[in-house]
Amino acid sequence: MLEANGISEDEVTLVANGKHQTAYATLTSGEVDATIIHNPYAALAEAEGTGHILGRAWDYIPDYYTGTIVASDRIIKEEPEKLQRFLNAYYEVHEKVKNEYFDEFITWLAQQMDVSEDVMRKAVEDEIDVWSDYPVIPEDRVEKTVEYLKEYGWLDENVQAEGTYTNEFAEKAAETLGLTDPAEK
């Protein structure tokens, strides 16, 4: 994001300021001038007049993959049917929330996060375009994510994406639920 706006790392001080409420508190207290933060805190900053959304990370690095469900080797090997049922249910709920129960979801989530429904609606609507309707991880995005992580020194050069993930269960969930790859539409 800095590079895309002509700012070098030498022009800023990078601070590990936590996440969620902690990162939001560093912004509202003036401890930091800017932060990368998840919603609803970005929307909350605008609503409270303590900050402005300057950009979304995925607009700068759209191939960076962040949405991940992780399972242990044990459950994959010993209880794959349980994992499959979980993923089927997860993606079924995902689709129903997005397409049938959106307002109820906003009400529930606002209560869980202790923010107003207006703030939560803005937070979710600001990000709804990146809610993937297809659970299968595109291999090229995984490769690109690994490249980014190596480029910025967050991942050892010897680490490869191959063998670190599986689409087996996501493919079965997509088939079971009738979800189609948006790239094929």
Segments and roles (model prediction):
Residues M1-T13, T22, K77-E81:
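Hinge/capping helix and adjacent helix->loop/strand transition within the periplasmic-binding protein
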Residues E3-N17, E31-D33, E117-D118, L155-A161:
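A local structural motif
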Residues K77-E157:
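Secondary-structure end/capping motifs
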Residues E147-K185:
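Conserved C-terminal helix/tail region of periplasmic/extracytoplasmic solute-binding proteins
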Residues A47-G49, T66-T68, V130-S132, F169-A173:
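Short secondary-structure transition/capping segments
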Residues Q21-Q111:
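Pocket-lining segment of extracytoplasmic ligand-binding domains
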Residues M1, L44, W108-L109, Y148, ...:
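Residues within well-ordered alpha helices
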Residues N5, E48, M113, Y152-G153, ...:
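Residues at alpha-helix termini
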